[in-house]
Amino acid sequence: MNLEQIYKDCGAYLEGHFLLSSGKHSQFYLQSAKVLEDPKLAAKLCNELAKIIASYKIEFDSICSPALGGILAGYELARACSKRFIFTERVNKEMTLRRGFEVKKGEKFIICEDIITTGGSALESAKIIESLGGIVVGFAALANRGFCAVENLKSPRKDNAKLPENLPLFTLGNFEFEIYDETNCPLCKKGSKAIKPGSRGN
């Protein structure tokens, strides 16, 4: 499966000057919503991801995703795995579990995102699950931006990665994009301003 080509064909592989959710800047952005707007394609991708997870014989009960970006990928993965799905969301900038969702003591979860950059949002969701008595057994995403180690791709962990080293991450592919702090961003130095994806229709 050529994940990069799928993103390009869907108009989801964007080039510009972007402010990522991690606070970093990048010349490229993956707009997964454009990929997941096609139910058949979303199902195809998440079915493939489910097969990868199953091949590692990871036992889990439910899937949790951080809103907003992870919801579609997480729901489709849960459907492919025949598992329960819940999501966390930010309230006053703090990740929380709402809407009557519950976590049973000892319930095993995979945390699913659309894209993993440093893994910060996924880690926040994992901490919520664990604080309520759940057990996080792994992470999953359609794609990894190259910072976190991916179990099935045998890709190495880099300094910016926030996901725990003792838990596996499964993805369909890696995108190796440079990301920058605002202070050393070459795009900023050229005078352009970083745009938060979605703020101007992108």
UniProtKB/Swiss-Prot annotation:
Q: What InterPro entries does the annotation carry?
A: OPRT (IPR023031), Orotate_PRibTrfase_bac (IPR006273), PRibTrfase_dom (IPR000836), PRTase-like (IPR029057)
Primary enzyme class: transferase
* One GO biological process term: 'de novo' UMP biosynthetic process
Q: Which CDD domains match?
A: PRTases_typeI
Pathway given in the UniProt record: Pyrimidine metabolism; UMP biosynthesis via de novo pathway; UMP from orotate: step 1/2
One family from Pfam that matches here is Pribosyltran
Annotated residues for binding of orotate: T117, R145
User: Which residue ranges traverse the bilayer?
Assistant: none
Reaction(s) this enzyme catalyzes, per UniProt: orotidine 5'-phosphate + diphosphate = orotate + 5-phospho-alpha-D-ribose 1-diphosphate
Write out the GO MF terms.
magnesium ion binding; orotate phosphoribosyltransferase activity
Which residues are listed for 5-phospho-alpha-D-ribose 1-diphosphate binding in this entry?
A: K93, E113, D114, I115, I116, T117, T118, G119, G120, S121
Enzyme Commission number, as recorded: 2.4.2.10
Q: Which UniProt keywords apply?
A: Glycosyltransferase, Magnesium, Pyrimidine biosynthesis, Transferase
Q: Which cofactor does it need?
A: Mg(2+)
UniProt superkingdom: Bacteria
Q: Which HAMAP family match?
A: PyrE
- Protein task: Catalyzes the transfer of a ribosyl phosphate group from 5-phosphoribose 1-diphosphate to orotate, leading to the formation of orotidine monophosphate (OMP).
- Known partners and oligomeric status: Homodimer.
The record's comment on protein family reads:
Belongs to the purine/pyrimidine phosphoribosyltransferase family. PyrE subfamily.
- What name does this protein carry? Orotate phosphoribosyltransferase
User: What is the source species?
Assistant: Campylobacter jejuni subsp. jejuni serotype O:23/36 (strain 81-176)
